[in-house]
Amino acid sequence: MKYKNIKRGIFIERPNRFIAHVEIDSVTEICHVKNTGRCKELLIPGTVVYIQKSDNPKRKTGFDLISVIKGSRHINMDSQAPNKLVQEWMEKGNLFSGITLVKAESRYKNSRFDFYVETKEDKIFIEVKGVTLEENNIAMFPDAPTERGVRHIKELCDSLHDGYKAYIIFVIQMKDVDYFIPNETTHREFSDALKSAYRKGVNILALDCVVEEGFIEIEKQVEVRL
């Protein structure tokens, strides 16, 4: 997945969840933050960030904040990227063979899952989560409590009883992590729900990514520790 019109900047501040002030070519610009998570460990004043200039002259903000440098690690922050990456990954023949249908944003009961996939043998629901939180080479999710995430997990479990297969895919938007864990400290209920789902037969995968200036792509599967 490639981004056009990428520029380097220096993060100044984040007045609210939706915008950031970034210094670009010695000028302070207002950028749209494509991630409403806290990201407090990433967006630190003085941090190098990469932003994308918008092609839409009518937008209130002329740039999108795409990625950030944390130490020696390049981390993509675009919350829209994980779904696109998983779709690209499946279209390349990874994960499932014999796919006959891929439908995004598919409703089941009270939830809307990211993907519904059919193969010659199976009907599958997939929920995708983007991961930007890393500590000591360990990737974690979530970075803030997510009741919606808990509901999705429980309804994925329900789908098993109706004959579907179910997957939760954590897209780690960086590389070189050792393994993935649920962030029990931040949201114990999510962690417990994920462990319960695994015991019931929901497939839990974590995939890391190659991240470069203006580029991100799924690389390989990472160990999940529950």
UniProtKB/Swiss-Prot annotation:
CDD domains: SfsA-like_bacterial. One of its GO terms (molecular function) is DNA binding. It holds the Pfam family SfsA. Transmembrane segments: none annotated. InterPro entries: SfsA, SfsA_C, SfsA_N. Belongs to the SfsA family. This is Sugar fermentation stimulation protein homolog. The gene is sfsA.
